[in-house]
Amino acid sequence: MSKTTDLVTADELERFPRDDRRYELVEGRVIPMSPVGYQHGKVVLQLGFLLSRYLKSQPVGVVMTEVGFKLEFGPDTVRAPDIAFIRAHRIPANTRGFFTGPPDLAIEVLSPDDRPSDVRAKVDQYLARGVALVVVVDPDQKTVTTWRPSTPPVPLRAEEDRLDLGDVIQGFSCSLREIFE
């Protein structure tokens, strides 16, 4: 940790012990992340699987889980969406450590203890830093909300509603039923 302040840098966060704890960094402050529950883990895996399967046939980028993205510097902010997508042309030669810059797509799956104000702040931060599409999935309500820059959020509630990521991952869509099965 820095001697002059209580703020932590992204480089310092990367050197934290790998002890199965997860952290995010918000304006230099370490935010511990709780372990996820059953529904959260199931939805992350299912949606990640759907995206991975599609990207095998259409290799336009890479999908990953819980990767740290350096979004702000001085003080540093590192966010780790539950699922993220980066277009192929943005993948750096050196993929060690946190990714510098925003993902093209950030997906957050809600946990029961997530506060709406915290989720909204995270969505706003992603959009302000250049994320093209933010998806918030609520496993308890079985709903999905999509957020794009300068447009109102779009809620999806019915099993037949389709999550369309075509503006980021061309051709990809799936029904809510597929996400929550």
Model feature map: region roles:
Residues 1-181:
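Gly/Pro/Ser/Thr-rich low-complexity, intrinsically disordered segments predominantly at protein N-termini
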